């Protein structure tokens, strides 16, 4: 039985090196989808590149941990910027949910303004949309807008409460990440999903060329290794041999 494989490159708009890596992995590799940070420093560059790559499906990478928000968020920002202290606020059950709801809507409208169309789907930077307090907001928004949502079902305990019309892949994997990136690792992700019986799978990735912005990231050089693996001709053949068809959330 043929299975759907969505290879989604996160962080479109983070930097020019990230943007070029994603485009390369789409044009000469197996990346079929990406998600864009509308407040990223290189988002305009990402928009420009995307015009020459119409086959690349583009979703929105909801941002609550980096850069400046599009709306006033006094309950989440420090000195006007977002940061990883959101984890502490979540643990303290002190997240400003109304502010987050407004910011989600603003980033969504900004995406449409930039790309001229709705995103194919939603996910988030550092997976913050999977926080128990935030997930219902994002799930409801995605269902209302008729777009798909990345769902990591491992930390999700209330999957029975999902909106009836919410679209997603059956499986999601973030395992293609870290210091041991290889073609074998990618194929193991597919084999694990097949054993679970997933008929559709999203694999998250971060292919990039190294630039000054990426150098500052804790996850730097493995992005270049990801790019090498994702553009391997042998990987594309191995995917087909396992009965997977490359696609995007438009196929879900």
From Swiss-Prot:
It is an enzyme of class 3 (hydrolase). Its EC number is 3.5.1.105. This is Chitooligosaccharide deacetylase. It comes from the Bacteria. One of its GO terms (cellular component) is cytoplasm. The keyword NAD does not apply. It catalyses: N,N'-diacetylchitobiose + H2O = N-acetyl-beta-D-glucosaminyl-(1->4)-D-glucosamine + acetate; diacetylchitobiose-6'-phosphate + H2O = N'-monoacetylchitobiose-6'-phosphate + acetate. GO terms for molecular function: chitin disaccharide deacetylase activity; deacetylase activity; metal ion binding. Belongs to the YdjC deacetylase family. ChbG subfamily. Homodimer. Transmembrane segments: none annotated. Pathway: Glycan degradation; chitin degradation. Keywords: Carbohydrate metabolism, Chitin degradation, Cytoplasm, Hydrolase, Magnesium, Metal-binding, Polysaccharide degradation. Mg(2+) binds at residues 61, 125. Its main location: cytoplasm. NCBIfam families: PRK02134.1. InterPro entries: COD_ChbG_bac, Glyco_hydro/deAcase_b/a-brl, YdjC-like. The keyword Hydrolase applies. Its cofactor is Mg(2+). It is found in: Cytoplasm. It holds the Pfam family YdjC. GO terms for biological process: chitin catabolic process; diacetylchitobiose catabolic process; polysaccharide catabolic process. Involved in the degradation of chitin. ChbG is essential for growth on the acetylated chitooligosaccharides chitobiose and chitotriose but is dispensable for growth on cellobiose and chitosan dimer, the deacetylated form of chitobiose. Deacetylation of chitobiose-6-P and chitotriose-6-P is necessary for both the activation of the chb promoter by the regulatory protein ChbR and the hydrolysis of phosphorylated beta-glucosides by the phospho-beta-glucosidase ChbF.
């Amino acid at each position: 039985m043929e299975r759907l494989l969505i290879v989604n490159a996160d962080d479109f708009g983070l930097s020019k090196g990230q943007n070029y890596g994603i485009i390369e992995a789409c044009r000469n590799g197996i990346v079929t989808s990406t998600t864009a940070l509308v407040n990223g420093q290189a988002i305009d560059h990402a928009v420009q590149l995307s015009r020459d790559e119409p086959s690349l499906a583009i979703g929105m990478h909801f941002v609550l941990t980096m850069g400046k928000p599009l709306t006033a968020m006094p309950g989440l920002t420090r000195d006007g910027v977002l940061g990883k202290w959101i984890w502490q606020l979540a643990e303290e059950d002190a997240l400003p949910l109304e502010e987050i709801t407004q910011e989600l809507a603003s980033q969504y409208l900004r995406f449409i303004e930039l790309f001229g169309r709705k995103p194919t789907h939603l996910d988030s930077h550092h997976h913050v949309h999977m926080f128990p307090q935030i997930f219902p907001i994002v799930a409801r928004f995605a269902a209302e807008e008729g777009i798909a949502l990345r769902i990591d079902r491992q930390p999700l305990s209330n999957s029975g409460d999902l909106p009836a019309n919410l679209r997603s892949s059956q499986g999601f994997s973030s395992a293609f990440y870290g210091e041991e990136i290889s073609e074998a690792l990618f194929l193991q992700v597919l084999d694990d999903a097949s054993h679970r019986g997933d008929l559709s799978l999203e694999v998250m990735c971060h292919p990039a060329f190294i630039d000054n912005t990426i150098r500052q990231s804790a996850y730097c050089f493995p992005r270049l290794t990801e790019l090498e693996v994702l553009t391997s001709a042998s990987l594309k053949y191995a995917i087909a041999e396992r009965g997977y068809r490359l696609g995007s959330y438009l196929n879900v």
